[in-house]
Amino acid sequence: MAVCPAPRRTPRTPQVTLSSPANPQPTARLALRTDQQEGIANTVRHLRRPHTRGHVVSACGTGKTLLALRASEELGVRHFAVAVPSLDLIAQWATAARADLRREPMITVSSLRAASHPVLAAAGADSTNAGEYLAYWLARHPRATVFFTFDSLSKIEEAQHSAVFPAPVFDLLVVDEAHATAGTWAKNWTALHDNSRIPADRRLYLTATPYVWEAPRLAEPPTTGPTPKRTTATAPHWDDPTLLATMDQPKIFGPRLHTYSHADAIDDGVLADYQLVVPTVTDDELRTTLTDPEAGPTARRTTALHLAILKAMREQDL
């Protein structure tokens, strides 16, 4: 990949902040689990060809970040870009990269100033909020990693389409929490999928939840009338949840390259198992517990729920 020529003019210095690592660095690379090794192998096999894309589905906390970092290494990626929905994730990615002994220059494109952020400063990351400076910075670094938020997508597009010195095409673009970009093309974030807007030789999408469902109704509607005795006939009817968005769209997200479910992670001891505690209060318990004739039906039921939660916490030693 050719390096961009030097710019005719440099942006103002306030648009970039420079920092250097201050904390002791790790000396050993992180060990990979079997599922991560399989995920990396599948990802590299598919993305070896340019102009390909694919997605990985793995439970939260199972190491998708490390999987993507190692895959980029095996693919020989030089200009590596990572898109995330939140500022906190930028810091997490930078920390994970340094913990895995990656030493390439890093820059963040967001509202964060790396020099003022303890994690990014410790990682030695630079930062900017200007697409023009990003293009100039990438021209000076033949191997580098760019972290940016979805909200800063326009700055990336600006850098790659600069008439003065366009930024190079990314060898690999990773989209974290990729389910947030699924759905209608009216979302600004869907520009991540468009190679004419954000040029990248390869795209890798990461998620733990490839399907986005409509939030269920968790409470009964308020009422001023008498509350009927709860029976099968009077119990609320819960409609089946509506699927709002899915990543099962190969033209956008590519094929699924690897799956590591929450259940598999629990079985393997990667994640802790959990128990679901459902507090309940019967109508008889409600009548004996609440005797205030002035309280409305909604207030009585709300109070009962509070008591049920306290009871469950006491019984479960929470």
Where are the language model's segments positioned?
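Conserved interdomain linker/interface between the two RecA-like ATPase lobes of SF2 helicase motors
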Residues: 241-318
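Walker A/P-loop
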Residues: 49-72
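Conserved helix/coil segment N-terminal to the catalytic DExD/H
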Residues: 131-169
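Conserved Walker A/P-loop ATP-binding site and its immediately adjacent core
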Residues: 70, 74-101, 108-113, 150-152
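Conserved helicase motor
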Residues: 108-129, 149-155, 180-183
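SF2 helicase catalytic motif II
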Residues: 150-152, 163-205, 209-212
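Conserved pre-motif I regulatory segment
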Residues: 17-55
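Conserved helicase ATPase motor motifs in RecA-like P-loop NTPase domains
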Residues: 57-61, 179-181, 195-221, 225-238, ...
